[in-house]
UniProtKB/Swiss-Prot annotation:
Family to which this protein belongs: Belongs to the RNA polymerase alpha chain family.
GO molecular function: DNA binding; DNA-directed RNA polymerase activity; protein dimerization activity
SMART domains: RPOLD
Gene this protein is translated from: rpoA
EC id: 2.7.7.6
SUPFAM superfamilies attached to this UniProt entry: C-terminal domain of RNA polymerase alpha subunit, Insert subdomain of RNA polymerase alpha subunit, RBP11-like subunits of RNA polymerase
Functional description taken from the UniProt entry: DNA-dependent RNA polymerase catalyzes the transcription of DNA into RNA using the four ribonucleoside triphosphates as substrates.
NCBIfam families membership: PRK05182.1-2, PRK05182.2-1, PRK05182.2-5, rpoA
Residues covered by region (Alpha N-terminal domain (alpha-NTD)): 1-233
Chemical reaction(s) catalysed: RNA(n) + a ribonucleoside 5'-triphosphate = RNA(n+1) + diphosphate
Keywords, in A-Z order: DNA-directed RNA polymerase, Nucleotidyltransferase, Transcription, Transferase
Protein name per Swiss-Prot or TrEMBL: DNA-directed RNA polymerase subunit alpha
UniProt note: domains: The N-terminal domain is essential for RNAP assembly and basal transcription, whereas the C-terminal domain is involved in interaction with transcriptional regulators and with upstream promoter elements.
Length: 340
């Protein structure tokens, strides 16, 4: 049963396009996947990235002299509704888990930007040039805003706090630190085969989390959600069958047999010869991906070899400690001479 996942081809590592990598953008590549896995994983990662990563946002605001969002403020060009819309665009990063209160106090004419928000050490403004309001010389703008952590989109009614002072207006909050995610799936080559998937993932963030970490967090969330479906211990996978000493001895001898004894097709035999593979032990120590990289070695030859090895109790990708063993080789040679 363990061959269900052991025999699948999978990427060795995630590649990053270093030339375009920034704190807000990253392009990632992973290949080869079995056909269909690129779309499955790409779509899953995209949905988790957009919906499930934690971030910080302004959840409510209290403006001095204002009781509701349909008011206007003397000396301020924007009405309260537009100011609230502008506050939604402020990108923040929090270094703690507790909600924090930040403030804006501005008198006289000028442009009020996100950089004018007075914060403490636990809150960082990531887009200080973001426009909030335009004030004239007789303006007196004082605001208190609550910043908290969350995930996804939270409507204003869920941000309402019954204990908040009169005049506090809840805001629709977009907590997600991810601005956009794209993924594409193209063909990947393994040996002579081109029917594998290559996943390309592009991630844009607001800067509160770097793209590499965002992808890692999303993958971790997926792993945790899927773990309940695994009904066995991953730490110590049992062998499919307990081998007797006699069976183990027979398998060992098979490893030292020549690949010519496998009676492969001419094409497969020539591929092994060109790859310098002489003994069955050398063959089974190669993975499927490594074999498919061999010149002229395709899926048909791979399946032929896998079937023959399976009849011998062997598989590709085996870890052979101490192979070849000189003592075993001498014993086998001696037995063959006696037979002659």
């Amino acid at each position: 049963m363990y061959r269900n996942w052991r025999d699948l081809i999978s990427p060795k590592k995630l590649q990053v396009e270093s030339e375009s990598l920034t704190n807000t953008y990253g392009k990632f590549f992973a290949e080869p996947f079995e056909r269909g896995f690129g779309t499955t994983l790409g779509n899953s990662l995209r949905r988790v990235l957009l919906s499930s990563l934690q971030g910080a946002a302004i959840s409510s605001v209290k403006i001095k002299g204002v009781l509701h969002e349909f008011s206007s403020i003397p000396g301020v060009t924007e009405d309260v509704t537009n100011i609230i819309l502008n506050l939604k665009g402020v990108s923040l990063k929090m270094h703690g888990n507790e909600a924090r209160t930040v403030r804006i106090i501005h008198k006289g004419d000028g442009i009020v930007k996100a950089g004018d928000i007075v914060t403490d050490a636990n809150v960082e403004i990531l887009n200080p040039d973001h426009h909030i309001a335009t004030c004239s010389k007789d303006a007196n703008l004082e605001m208190e805003m609550v910043v908290k952590l969350g995930k996804g989109y939270v409507p204003s009614d869920r941000n309402r706090d019954e204990k908040a002072p009169v005049g506090t207006m809840p805001i629709d909050a977009i907590f997600s630190p991810i601005k956009k995610v794209n993924f594409t799936v193209s063909n990947a080559r393994v040996g002579q085969m081109t029917d594998y998937d290559k996943l390309t993932l592009e991630v844009w963030t607001n800067g509160s989390v770097v793209p590499e970490d965002a992808v890692a967090f999303a993958a971790k969330i997926l792993k945790e959600q899927l773990s309940i479906f695994i009904n066995f211990d991953e730490e110590a996978e049992p062998a499919e069958e307990a081998e007797t000493e006699e069976e183990r001895e027979r398998v060992n001898e098979n490893l030292y047999r020549s690949v010519d004894e496998l009676e492969l097709s001419v094409r497969s035999a020539n591929c092994l010869k060109n790859a310098g593979i002489k003994m069955i032990g050398e063959l089974v120590s190669r993975s499927e991906a490594e074999m498919l990289k061999t010149q002229n070695f395709g899926r048909k030859s791979l399946n032929e070899i896998k079937d023959i090895l399976a009849d011998m109790g062997l598989t590709l990708g085996m870890k052979l400690d101490g192979f070849p063993d000189p003592e075993v080789m001498r014993r086998i040679r001696g037995e063959r001479k006696d037979e002659e």
